[in-house]
């Protein structure tokens, strides 16, 4: 991508990892040059140049604290606008010191601590992923002399509250947010950071040796999978709208058996080959259900009602009145399995479709 100037850029954003790298760089620069930078130019791991504004910076003796405001561009998320503070302490090594020129990166208040196996970070450590850690380290090393070492402490004011609105509690990351971002760049409409937060669920499930994983769109599926399937928390994988991405990850990680489970409004789309189920991408629920209903009945008036329905629940009511609800949704659930099996052929799939109350509408076996 070359260079992105985030003082001007409004479409792209920068990750929590890029915030930490920029803040750490500005703090160390202040310590070494006694100059407060209003912005810094750092490099990501691909060699792209990122120009990131610095919100505030202050110094006490050999420590400087820099604040960077998270900016998500057009992909507004829960972390947009939050402050990330980086406290950098610089030490000069003498000839007798046992330390070597190095960068130490630690977490502080508002940065989560990992408690479960299977993630990129070991249990007991702060949730600072390897790629952003490497980006922070590389940019700090560019300022260090051979006889210097530095400690960078990352903290996020109110990070513990913000984290409650993320997947961190489910992943076993407690007390704060994660420092994420492979490239440091948040691309519009890509949801890269959000996808990156979803994928570790698979690692946790595999670390607990679950053979069958239950893929659900979100909270409704999670709630009823625990009740109907007696599923364990770490066995349930919340996919959101990103079925293609998450199933690619499952295949990549060697998952053999997946149960697709959730509300008809999302799962029906999979039968039509729609693997990003966000309504802005595609919404063919009515058309798909109309097509499968037409295999059972030629009642044109009813088919028209299905096409004109406002919600999937309305269609469920129409099919119930006609007495063909189960027959239609069993066909749909079987088609979901066929669609997924064609693309992710090494995974054994089953499918269960429910309504808002958790009633089973149809299943593939």
Curated annotation (Swiss-Prot):
SUPFAM superfamilies linked to this entry: CbiD-like (SSF111342)
Entry's family note: Belongs to the CbiD family.
Reactions listed under catalytic activity: Co-precorrin-5B + S-adenosyl-L-methionine = Co-precorrin-6A + S-adenosyl-L-homocysteine
Organism: Methanococcus maripaludis (strain DSM 14266 / JCM 13030 / NBRC 101832 / S2 / LL)
Uppermost EC category: transferase
Keywords: Cobalamin biosynthesis, Methyltransferase, S-adenosyl-L-methionine, Transferase
GO MF annotations in UniProt: cobalt-precorrin-5B C1-methyltransferase activity
HAMAP family from the UniProt entry: CbiD (MF_00787)
Protein name stated in the entry: Cobalt-precorrin-5B C(1)-methyltransferase
Annotated InterPro entries: CbiD (IPR002748), CbiD_sf (IPR036074)
EC number in record: 2.1.1.195
The protein's annotated pathway: Cofactor biosynthesis; adenosylcobalamin biosynthesis; cob(II)yrinate a,c-diamide from sirohydrochlorin (anaerobic route): step 6/10
Classification via Gene3D superfamilies: CbiD-like (3.30.2110.10)
Any Gene Ontology biological process: methylation
